[in-house]
Structures are given as C-alpha cells and as structure tokens.
C-alpha cells in the first residue's frame, strides 16, 4: 500500500526525521528557506512502511513532516494545513 510523505516549510533542517526513518525514505537536500540551509525530502516514498517515526522525531511545534497512510484520503491530507 502506497503512503504519501509531505514535508512542510516549517522544516528547520535538523535531520531528526532522516535519522529516525528505518527504511531510508528521507534525505536532506539544499534549501535556502531555513537557517540550516537544508530541508528534508522524501524521494523514496515507495519504501515507506507507515511507521511515522519521522513524525515522532520532528521537534517543530507543527509537525514539518507528515505520513499519510494509503487508506487516508486526499481530502484529509488537505486538512493538515
């Protein structure tokens, strides 16, 4: 079952989510929008197992990364904003 991984612009570039992911779905890429000059990216979502460890590791007040399981609808994804 496919999962959708969304990275939001509240990402502070701390790498906590990348280190927490057991399947290496996430990686850091260059980005000028934060102090760390990097942001999380999810280039391998097909490997996501839906464990949501990345969400648990995120230190921002509003989770900068969200995993939407295959059973969740596109509508519920839109409500996350």
Curated annotation (Swiss-Prot):
Keywords: 4Fe-4S, Chloroplast, Electron transport, Iron, Iron-sulfur, Membrane, Metal-binding, Oxidoreductase, Photosynthesis, Photosystem I, Plastid, Repeat, Thylakoid, Transport. Its cofactor is [4Fe-4S] cluster. It catalyses: reduced [plastocyanin] + hnu + oxidized [2Fe-2S]-[ferredoxin] = oxidized [plastocyanin] + reduced [2Fe-2S]-[ferredoxin]. One of its GO terms (molecular function) is metal ion binding. [4Fe-4S] cluster 2 binds at residues 21, 48, 51, 54. The keyword Coiled coil does not apply. Residues 2-31, 39-68 form the 4Fe-4S ferredoxin-type domain. Its EC number is 1.97.1.12. The keyword Signal does not apply. It is a peripheral membrane protein. One of its GO terms (cellular component) is chloroplast thylakoid membrane. [4Fe-4S] cluster 1 binds at residues 11, 14, 17, 58. One of its GO terms (biological process) is photosynthetic electron transport in photosystem I. It is found in: Plastid, Chloroplast thylakoid membrane. Binds 2 [4Fe-4S] clusters. Cluster 2 is most probably the spectroscopically characterized electron acceptor FA and cluster 1 is most probably FB. Apoprotein for the two 4Fe-4S centers FA and FB of photosystem I (PSI); essential for photochemical activity. FB is the terminal electron acceptor of PSI, donating electrons to ferredoxin. The C-terminus interacts with PsaA/B/D and helps assemble the protein into the PSI complex. Required for binding of PsaD and PsaE to PSI. PSI is a plastocyanin-ferredoxin oxidoreductase, converting photonic excitation into a charge separation, which transfers an electron from the donor P700 chlorophyll pair to the spectroscopically characterized acceptors A0, A1, FX, FA and FB in turn. HAMAP family: PSI_PsaC. NCBIfam families: PS_I_psaC. The eukaryotic PSI reaction center is composed of at least 11 subunits. This is Photosystem I iron-sulfur center. The lineage of its organism: Eukaryota, Viridiplantae, Streptophyta, Embryophyta, Tracheophyta.
